[in-house]
């Protein structure tokens, strides 16, 4: 079920137009369940490829919440090996610019990989929410979990284009 990892040169080796340098931390997106729609699979791969231009990224499909926590580096035996962010309707909402700042701050201050997790149709258990470092929401509307994945991936890509001063975001 696991997807291959896509790599990019570290942001620390790149400079943006303001000559700022960025340190890179791996980003992992983990979701529950197989992708049923070919269009969703195609968009997932497209955005993983785009994100890989800026940072090492990995997309991983898992069977259930227990596998999700293990793949994200949050097992009882191993402890915490990543910063876990769950997509949840009760989470904090961000504008695209605020989300870019959130990612940039993590890149600058935290050496652990950043794992975004998307639950299944029933969301996350209280135990998973307690294990998370933060909860974020894609908005007040409810999205199908496969669609939420594509929206998250697009926003991660958009965040890196904002951080790098790329014109992708300027059309808003």
Language model region names:
Residues 16-18:
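Intrinsic-disorder-associated, low-complexity terminal segments enriched in Asp/Asn/His/Tyr and depleted
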Residues 126-172:
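Structured adenosyl-cofactor binding patch, chiefly the S-adenosyl-L-methionine
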Residues 35, 89-92, 120-123:
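Short glycine-rich anion-binding loops that position phosphate/pyrophosphate groups of nucleotides
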Residues 5-7, 12:
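Serine residues within intrinsically disordered or low-complexity segments
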Residues 52-115:
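S-adenosyl-L-methionine/SAH cofactor-binding core of RNA-modifying enzymes
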Residues 29, 85, 119, 152:
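Conserved RecA-like P-loop NTPase ATPase core
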Residues 20-47, 51:
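N-terminal beta1-alpha1 ligand-phosphate binding loop
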């Amino acid at each position: 079920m696991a997807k291959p990892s896509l790599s990019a040169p570290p942001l620390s080796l790149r400079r943006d137009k303001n000559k700022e340098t960025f340190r890179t931390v791996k980003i992992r997106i983990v979701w529950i369940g197989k992708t049923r729609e070919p269009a969703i699979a195609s968009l997932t791969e497209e955005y993983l490829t785009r994100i890989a231009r800026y940072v090492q990224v990995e997309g991983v499909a898992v069977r259930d919440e227990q596998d999700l926590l293990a793949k994200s580096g949050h097992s009882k035996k191993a402890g915490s090996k990543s910063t876990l962010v769950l997509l949840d309707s009760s989470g904090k909402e961000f504008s695209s610019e605020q989300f870019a700042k959130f990612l940039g701050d993590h890149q600058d201050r935290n050496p652990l990989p950043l794992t975004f997790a998307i639950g299944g149709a029933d969301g996350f258990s209280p135990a998973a929410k307690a294990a998370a470092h933060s909860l974020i929401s894609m908005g007040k509307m409810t999205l199908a979990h496969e669609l939420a994945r594509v929206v998250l991936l697009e926003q991660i890509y958009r965040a890196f284009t904002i951080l790098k001063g790329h014109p992708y975001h300027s059309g808003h």
